Structures are given as structure tokens and as C-alpha cells.
């Protein structure tokens, strides 16, 4: 995924910023507590496709 997209993409649920996961397979929204998958370099920005972050993941910086 092109990291330049992070400058313009926002979480569709909370409208907050997104962060690319360390393994580059998810876009993380701390505000919504969701992780959106990145498939074949394309972010899937659907709430129904996102997974809920664990408590530990929400507390990470």
C-alpha cells in the first residue's frame, strides 16, 4: 500500500486518522477501535470487514 494514502484517508466510522500496522496488513483506527484489512495493497474501508482491536492494541502508542 502506498503510505502517501495515509495523508488523505480517514476512518469511515470516527473520521479520525489511520496508522499502517507494522506488518502492513491493516490500517488501524484508535478512535474507532478498529483495524481495516489491506488486501493486495488495497485498503478495505468497510466497517463490516474491520476487526475490533483488543484492549492491549488500543493502549499501544
UniProtKB/Swiss-Prot annotation:
GO terms for cellular component: cytosol. InterPro entries: Trm112-like. Pfam families: Trm112p (PF03966). Transmembrane segments: none annotated. Gene3D superfamilies: 2.20.25.10. Belongs to the UPF0434 family. PANTHER family: PROTEIN PREY, MITOCHONDRIAL, ZGC:162634. This is UPF0434 protein PSPPH_1629.
Amino acid at each position: 500500500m502506498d503510505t502517501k494514502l495515509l495523508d488523505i484517508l480517514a476512518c469511515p466510522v470516527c473520521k479520525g486518522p489511520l496508522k499502517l500496522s507494522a506488518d502492513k496488513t491493516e490500517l488501524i483506527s484508535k478512535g474507532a477501535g478498529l483495524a481495516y484489512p489491506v488486501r493486495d495493497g488495497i485498503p478495505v474501508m468497510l466497517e463490516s470487514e474491520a476487526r475490533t482491536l483488543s484492549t492491549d492494541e488500543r493502549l499501544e502508542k
